Curated annotation (Swiss-Prot):
Record family assignment: Belongs to the aspartate/ornithine carbamoyltransferase superfamily. OTCase family.
Catalytic activity: carbamoyl phosphate + L-ornithine = L-citrulline + phosphate + H(+)
Example of a GO MF term: ornithine carbamoyltransferase activity
Keywords: Arginine metabolism, Cytoplasm, Transferase
GO cellular component: cytoplasm
Pathway annotation from the record: Amino-acid degradation; L-arginine degradation via ADI pathway; carbamoyl phosphate from L-arginine: step 2/2
This protein's name: Ornithine carbamoyltransferase
Source organism: Azoarcus sp. (strain BH72)
Transmembrane stretches, start-end: none
Biological classification of the source: Bacteria, Pseudomonadati, Pseudomonadota, Betaproteobacteria, Rhodocyclales
Amino acid sequence: MSSPRHYLQFSDFTAAEYDHVFQRTRWIKEKFKQYEPYHPLFDRTLVMIFEKASTRTRLSFEAGMQQLGGSAIYLNTRDSQLGRGEPVEDAAQVISRMSDLVMIRTFEQDIIERFAAYSRVPVINGLTNEYHPCQILADIYTFIEHRGSIKGKTVAWVGDSNNMCNTWLQAAEVLDFKVRVSTPPGYEVEPTDAGLRGTAHFAQFSDPLEACRGADLVTTDVWTSMGFEAENEARMKAFADWCVDAEMMSVAAPDALFMHCLPAHRGEEVTAEVIDGPQSVVWDEAENRLHVQKALMEYLVLGRVGDEESN
């Protein structure tokens, strides 16, 4: 039995593979909009394991698998043996014998890496403290829909150097664009934590306005991610000057887009004027989680299909 292909961080795929996935996303989304059934994963089963709560991740994967003709089973660690001390490695061997695909949303990247090492089927990272590849997959596809190729473009990341930031930095290496990161002192990017090969595709700025200057895309996330609630008060003070506002958008490129993975806190990491304004594409971004993940699941289970249809 050959080893399954996993999607645990953005750097797991090549630029050519992303080109294929984005082409399939476009084709699959068109089918969806035209109410044309497409069931390449008929009778296949996706198991979704949640340790972290979610709205968009669960909805997009569960609906996506059903739309592809398969079924999705929801597990959380409170209601399964995973929450009662069963070794991750044992759970992986059992769950992967009863399913065709596994998506895990958890805290530590180590958990998903260990699960994948013992899984007989593909494993997808639905989010960890370190990486959020499915979200950046949707973000980049959304940029492509609105502005074309992201190659050679500039992305400004304003806020916490969290899992989203890490994944944007990996994406820049794979797809050849630049990321300008601005964080408060003490929250800077650590290239090794982000899993980077080098520093050629990103730069750090102490001034968020300078990070946004000329950027083609400005993006951010909440200041306090799940699992860091104890730091919330300190973070509110530290990040006060890192709220994406109209001034930051005004120094970006004239056609710059704004993105946020949601849920958002208006008045904290972004003003209502920006997130609800004409440059914001957050609703397209959220919807595209559904379509890119359908293309991702198709690719992981079936390999390259439909190249002629996608072109």
